[in-house]
């Protein structure tokens, strides 16, 4: 996921990340149907990329986006839920990252990680992003720049 995006605000930037990781999951799914000898190695590399992208994205949300949103909106239960969802994602990511080679559970773990991610993205799009955009105390354009800067550091 590129650090610079054409999005106008923090929500647009985060959603661009969502779209990019969705594409990675789709690419992985296509590889699961491949009978090519190189498919296993490609799946492992793609899974590692997915894990990196999700780890950086979650860290950005937890360090920058969620704290700013927590100060700007009254209903913070959604933020608590989002952080719990991040922990579930991290648990699966940790399991995938310790694998030197895909085993019989590897594809299932990547698939479930994708499903968890899709659920999380849907909640952000339908609940968190509208609340963020409605919050008067939140400068989403400035927050976007903060996210871009932090992401560049994390991806370096």
Q: Predicted regions: what is each one?
A:
Residues 1-156:
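Small-residue-biased structural context
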């Amino acid at each position: 996921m590129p650090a610079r995006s054409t999005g106008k605000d923090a929500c647009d930037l985060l959603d661009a990340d969502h779209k990019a990781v969705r594409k990675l999951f789709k690419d992985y799914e296509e590889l699961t149907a491949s009978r090519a000898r190189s498919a296993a190695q490609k799946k492992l590399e793609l899974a590692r990329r997915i894990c990196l992208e999700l780890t950086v994205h979650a860290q950005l949300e937890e360090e920058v986006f969620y704290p700013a949103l927590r100060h700007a909106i009254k209903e913070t239960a959604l933020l608590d839920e989002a952080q719990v969802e991040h922990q579930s994602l991290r648990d699966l990511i940790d399991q995938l990252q310790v694998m030197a080679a895909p085993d019989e559970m590897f594809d299932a773990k990547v698939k479930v990680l994708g499903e968890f991610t899709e659920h999380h993205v849907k909640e952000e799009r339908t609940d968190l992003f509208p609340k963020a955009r409605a919050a008067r105390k939140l400068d989403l354009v400035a927050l976007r720049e903060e996210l871009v800067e932090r992401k560049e550091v994390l991806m370096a």
